[in-house]
């Protein structure tokens, strides 16, 4: 599961960074894969949102942190990786298999896995030994807590259809934030603090 999220993260990062700026070679295919994953997730809707209004919840997506330019390059890469990994983990459970169309779900899992694989190469080149420290603190820990809240919500709602629909909408927000962070990395040549 972690491998797939790593792949998704790699694809996203590749699509939003100029060649060589992050010390890795991610193709334009990575960007397209990120868009395809977002589209697949949108197609997974099974219930009208109006039927699930009572189940809505603010999960506290760390959107400002992800999109607001607060992250250094190595932190941004670690956050991208963690978000993709957690998305992959969420959709790679037995309970998610029962909730979604299996064909769409498998395509999403495959796309996330590919992005994580691509990002793993970049993560290793850019962060090296620092990665384990970055994953245990700061922004990456914030991402882990965000996804832990989603898992707790699903458990509390007993993995109901509406709970999964609410989570699906939230994951669309998360993947959109990932895309914006990738674009920012690409525009800034990997330097998130550039004007």
From Swiss-Prot:
> Mainly localized where?
secreted
One MF term in the entry's GO annotations: hormone activity
Query: What keywords appear on the UniProt entry?
Result: Antiviral defense, Cytokine, Disulfide bond, Hormone, Pregnancy, Secreted, Signal
Q: Does the keyword Disulfide bond apply?
A: yes
Database matches in Gene3D superfamilies: 1.20.1250.10
What CDD domains does the record point to? IFab (cd00095)
Q: Which InterPro entries match?
A: 4_helix_cytokine-like_core, Interferon_alpha/beta/delta
Please give the tissue specificity annotation from the record for this chain. Answer: Constitutively and exclusively expressed in the mononuclear cells of the extraembryonic trophectoderm.
Q: Which cysteines are joined by disulfide bonds?
A: 24-122, 52-162
Any Gene Ontology biological process:
defense response to virus
Subcellular location per the Swiss-Prot or TrEMBL entry: Secreted
The signal peptide annotation in the UniProt record is 1-23
Domain of life, source organism: Eukaryota
One GO CC term on file: extracellular space
Function noted in UniProt:
Paracrine hormone primarily responsible for maternal recognition of pregnancy. Interacts with endometrial receptors, probably type I interferon receptors, and blocks estrogen receptor expression, preventing the estrogen-induced increase in oxytocin receptor expression in the endometrium. This results in the suppression of the pulsatile endometrial release of the luteolytic hormone prostaglandin F2-alpha, hindering the regression of the corpus luteum (luteolysis) and therefore a return to ovarian cyclicity.
Which family would the database say this protein is a member of?
Belongs to the alpha/beta interferon family. IFN-alphaII subfamily.
Give the miscellaneous note. Answer: IFN-tau genes are intronless. They evolved from IFN-omega genes in the ruminantia suborder and have continued to duplicate independently in different lineages of the ruminantia. They code for proteins very similar in sequence but with different biological potency and pattern of expression.
| Name this protein carries in UniProt | Interferon tau
Q: Which organism is it from?
A: Cervus elaphus
Its gene name is IFNT
